[in-house]
């Protein structure tokens, strides 16, 4: 089977290996912590859900190899990385990529640096599209914020970073969280897993679904919904649903038409699961 590819790009100590470990569940990855540079690492893994099976190559790269690099130096190195990435030499890599995760260290990366870096990420996003249709790329891009172990980042700073990322039409994921937020949306580590599992992959093998089990699950969900509708003591959480829809609509304003269609389908699936 032809493998799929995603790229995790970031500076040293920004959570790249943690993300790769989360996706692959590979116990060997932590042994790479002592490697001097993570540039060029490839983690080969596979993914199986109840619907499909696929092979996945997780490409890890660093645009700066020094933890002590200044913001100016990191930006210069990131821009240099982008110039190489968009060159003809890397055309084959761009063609096979299904996703990009850009990692930042929310404790050490300044707001100014993050803002400038996001502008370069936007250029990387454009380079992944077709020359005639700049946004005709079926992959995903997420900005993942991490924090060193046993350290805390202020909530106000996290919100400021999230707003900056969303204003660029990109998704922000805080690696320090997990579970669901108040709107029943997956967040943090669980959102990364959901993003990977729900993506429309280029190469995969569909698995046969047990039709009887599917019907059983469907009937059980319908019965649960019916009970919520007829039982006054059961709340349907309509306020949560409307809040989710309003948030989704606001987020969709910053997306292209093609991205809106995919995002709308994803939100609909989440609401159905929520019900």
UniProtKB/Swiss-Prot annotation:
The keyword Signal does not apply. GO terms for molecular function: protein-macromolecule adaptor activity. It holds the Pfam family Adaptin_binding. GO terms for biological process: vesicle-mediated transport. Keywords: Chromosomal rearrangement. The keyword Cell inner membrane does not apply. InterPro entries: Irc6. PANTHER family: INCREASED RECOMBINATION CENTERS PROTEIN 6. Belongs to the IRC6 family. Involved in gross chromosomal rearrangements (GCRs) and telomere healing. This is Increased recombination centers protein 6. The gene is IRC6.
């Amino acid at each position: 089977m032809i493998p799929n590819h995603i790229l995790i790009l970031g500076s040293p100590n920004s959570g790249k290996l943690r993300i790769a470990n989360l996706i692959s569940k590979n116990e060997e990855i932590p042994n790479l912590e002592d490697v001097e540079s993570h540039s060029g690492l490839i983690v080969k893994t596979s993914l199986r859900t109840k619907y499909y099976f696929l092979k996945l190559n997780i490409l890890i790269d660093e645009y700066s190899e020094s933890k002590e690099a200044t913001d100016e130096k990191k930006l210069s190195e990131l821009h240099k990385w982008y110039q190489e990435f968009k060159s003809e030499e890397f055309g084959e890599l761009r063609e096979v990529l299904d996703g990009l995760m850009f990692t930042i260290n929310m404790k050490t990366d300044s707001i100014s640096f993050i803002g400038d870096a996001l502008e370069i990420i936007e250029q990387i996003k454009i380079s992944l599209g077709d020359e005639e249709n700049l946004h005709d790329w079926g992959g995903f891009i997420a900005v993942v914020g991490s924090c060193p172990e046993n350290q805390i980042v202020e909530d106000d700073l996290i919100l400021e970073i999230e707003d900056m990322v969303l204003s660029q039409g990109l998704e922000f994921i805080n690696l320090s969280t997990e579970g669901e937020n108040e709107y029943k949306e997956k967040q943090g580590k669980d959102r990364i897993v959901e993003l990977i599992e729900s993506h429309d992959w280029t190469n995969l093998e569909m698995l046969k679904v047990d039709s009887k089990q599917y019907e059983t699950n469907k009937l059980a969900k319908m019965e649960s919904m019916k009970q919520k509708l007829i039982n006054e003591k059961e709340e349907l959480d309509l306020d949560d649903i409307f809040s989710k829809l309003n948030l989704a609509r606001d987020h969709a304003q910053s997306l292209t038409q093609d991205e809106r269609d995919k995002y709308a389908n994803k939100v609909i699936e989440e609401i159905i699961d929520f019900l």
